Each structure stands twice: as structure tokens, then as C-alpha cells.
Amino acid sequence: MTEILTTSNSAEDLLDMDGRVSEQRLAQLRIRQQQERVTKELRDVIQIHQCKKGIFCLVKQAKISYEITATDHRLSYELGPQRQKFTCMVGINPIVITQQSGDTKGCIHCSCDSIECTYTLLKTLCGLRDLLPMN
């Protein structure tokens, strides 16, 4: 006799299976689904972001993550090393200036009640170089 085992991910089946462990699994599943939804929304907002800086905007250059905690929202960003090269003429001699900066990491916190502040946080990141000039 062959038994057919079926698996179901409905909330009722998870709770009936083994009580407290099922509740923990269900809570983890909800958290994971919420984080996946937030990640997808973040990707969408980054895709549609446009400003006059174009590809030089921090929103387009940075590796961005978004976290929702019980007390606040946090947009974390990370920029890799950046290199600038500038050439100018002094008389007839060219002068080349090369400048390199290391990794830049940071985060922007928001303690509002709305979970829909992703766009505002991205606009803040977009204007960050105007607020805090970096080399």
C-alpha cells in the first residue's frame, strides 16, 4: 500500500499540524513574504526614479536595501570605490589630477508610521550629495 503525502501551505494546515512551531513558521513566512514584497517595490521605485543627474545619481549607482522594523524604516546604501580624473592646461603643459575614494556606506532612518515612505527616502538619497558634499 502506497501512501500519498501532500503538502499544503495554507495557514489553517500550518496551525493544525503542530501548534507553536507552526505559528512560528507562519510568522516567519509572513515576514519573508513582506520583505520580498518590500524588495520588489524598492526595485520598482529605483527603476522609475529619474532626475537630472541621470546615471550619476546615487540612487542609480548605489547598492540599496530597505528594512522595516517595529520602530522605523531604514534605507541602507553602499557605494563602491570611485575614481575621478581631471585634466587641465597650465600654459602649454597639461596637468592631470586623479582622485580616488574608498567604499561609502550609510543609512537613512525614518520613524514615520507609514510603510510607504520608500519614495521619500530615495529622493533623500538622490539629494544627499547636495546635503552632505562628498569628494
UniProtKB/Swiss-Prot annotation:
InterPro entries for this protein: Adeno_E3-15 (IPR004985)
Stated name of the protein: Early E3 15.3 kDa protein
A GO BP annotation: symbiont-mediated suppression of host apoptosis
Protein purpose: Protects virus-infected cells from TNF-induced cytolysis.
Protein family: Belongs to the adenoviridae E3_15 family.
Pfam families: Adeno_E3_15_3
Protein's UniProt keywords contain Zinc-finger: no
UniProt keywords, alphabetically: Early protein, Host-virus interaction, Inhibition of host caspases by virus, Modulation of host cell apoptosis by virus
Keyword Chloroplast belongs to the record: no
